[in-house]
Amino acid sequence: MLSIFVEASCNRYVRDECRFCHVYAPLKPILESREYWHMTPDTAGLMVEKIRSVEPLKDLAKKEINLTGGEASQNPHIVEIYKVFRTLSDNVRLHTNLDINSEKSKRWERLVEITRLRGRIDITLYPTVWESRQQPLLGKIIKLQNGLIVNLIYE
């Protein structure tokens, strides 16, 4: 599997959309502008070109690509990025913490769209938000797709 970070910032405390960055020096100066917080489809395209030119990476990517990061679903471009990486592999996954306020959030809509495009959503479960936010959405994710990887965190 090839794991690709598509999100520079993550703030799981502002659950549905990123509002500020908590990444610290030495990365902070390049993240002052929000345009650098998220990978773009153009950057994803450049990465795909590079991956295709490095045989071991290309072989790994063909098996599986995992889109991850601080919180990949906060990237407003994630559906388009997913489509770009699908040109490299039929097996593209997205990892999320599923710490989302509701089914009406943009993050949830992005996850649903990726499952419609035959992507798989994998999640990390946290006891601190399990009952309030993750449990209701986990059942919905399971209905949208066949199989998933679940990481459990004990806090």
Feature annotation, model-predicted:
Residues 1-7, 14-17, 53-61:
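N-terminal [4Fe-4S]-dependent radical SAM core
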Residues 2-3, 23-42, 58-75, 88-104, ...:
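Core AdoMet radical
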Residues 9-10, 72:
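Hydrophobic adenine-recognition pocket in adenosine-nucleotide-binding enzymes
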Residues 11, 19-22:
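Cys/His/Pro-rich metal-binding microdomains
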Residues 11-13, 28:
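Short, acidic Gly/Pro/Ser/Thr-rich loop/turn segments
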Residues 25, 51-54:
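Alpha-helix boundary/capping residues
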Residues 45-52, 79-82, 108-112, 135-142:
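Generic structural signal for well-ordered alpha-helices
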Residues 80-87, 155:
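Short, electropositive alpha-helical surface patch
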